[in-house]
């Protein structure tokens, strides 16, 4: 049976066929003034088989959001997936996939050196008690150890 095409690009991806971890261009949108948004799927865990624990995922989100912007002003958004298997990272007007890979690798190394989770307090975070720096660093270490797999999605 053929599946209906969905409006959300990731819903059209066969989640059983992918091999995490990987980094793939998930979507590209061209604005009315010519700006282009590149949305990347940063998949950490194998869909429907494993997921990141929430405190580690939450801290990794904060660390990526803060530290990646030290390396590029083209970062629009970093969003965790509800399924807890990865993140979406959106870049503005940066078409080079290798630049995205370098940004991620550099930022993951920054995370390994981090001594605290940024904005990990009730004033700056909606669930400040739900963080794990060591958990985020474990995920960063895992991704860096599997760097050679990032470019192969299937």
From Swiss-Prot:
Reactions that this protein is recorded to catalyse: S-(5-deoxy-D-ribos-5-yl)-L-homocysteine = (S)-4,5-dihydroxypentane-2,3-dione + L-homocysteine
Domain of life of the source: Bacteria
Protein role: Involved in the synthesis of autoinducer 2 (AI-2) which is secreted by bacteria and is used to communicate both the cell density and the metabolic potential of the environment. The regulation of gene expression in response to changes in cell density is called quorum sensing. Catalyzes the transformation of S-ribosylhomocysteine (RHC) to homocysteine (HC) and 4,5-dihydroxy-2,3-pentadione (DPD).
Family: Belongs to the LuxS family.
Keywords: Autoinducer synthesis, Iron, Lyase, Metal-binding, Quorum sensing
HAMAP family: LuxS (MF_00091)
Coiled-coil region list: none
Spans traversing the lipid bilayer: none
Protein's UniProt name: S-ribosylhomocysteine lyase
GO biological-process terms attached to the record: quorum sensing
Subunit comment: Homodimer.
Organism: Dichelobacter nodosus (strain VCS1703A)
Cofactor note: Binds 1 Fe cation per subunit.
Binding residue positions for Fe cation: 58, 62, 125
EC number: 4.4.1.21
MF (Gene Ontology): iron ion binding; S-ribosylhomocysteine lyase activity
Gene giving rise to this polypeptide: luxS
């Amino acid at each position: 049976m053929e599946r209906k095409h969905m409006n959300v690009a990731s819903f059209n991806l066969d989640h059983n066929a992918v091999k995490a971890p990987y980094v793939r261009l998930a979507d590209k949108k061209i604005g009315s003034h010519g700006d282009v948004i590149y949305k990347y799927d940063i998949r950490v865990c194998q869909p429907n088989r494993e997921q990141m624990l929430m405190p580690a995922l939450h801290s990794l989100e904060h660390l990526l959001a803060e530290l990646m912007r030290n390396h590029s002003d083209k970062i629009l958004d970093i969003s965790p997936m509800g399924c807890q298997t990865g993140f979406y990272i959106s870049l503005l007007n940066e078409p080079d996939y290798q630049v995205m890979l370098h940004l991620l690798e550099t930022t993951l190394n920054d995370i390994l050196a981090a001594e605290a989770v940024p904005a990990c307090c009730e004033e700056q975070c909606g669930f400040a008690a739900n963080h794990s720096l060591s958990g985020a660093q474990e995920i960063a270490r895992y991704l860096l150890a599997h760097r050679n797999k990032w470019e192969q999605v299937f």
